[in-house]
Amino acid sequence: MKIRASIRRICGKCRPIRRRKRVMIICSNPRHKQKQG
């Protein structure tokens, strides 16, 4: 899980979602998981 100020898609399978008022990126590749914070 990477925590970044600005999150962006790394590949075509990355999907932005909102959880607990935070934007996250979920992907089939676990290295692409990101959280905005």
UniProtKB/Swiss-Prot annotation:
One of its GO terms (molecular function) is structural constituent of ribosome. Keywords: Chloroplast, Plastid, Ribonucleoprotein, Ribosomal protein. The keyword Chloroplast applies. The keyword Membrane does not apply. PROSITE patterns: RIBOSOMAL_L36 (PS00828). It is found in: Plastid, Chloroplast. Belongs to the bacterial ribosomal protein bL36 family. This is Large ribosomal subunit protein bL36c. It comes from Pinus thunbergii (Japanese black pine).
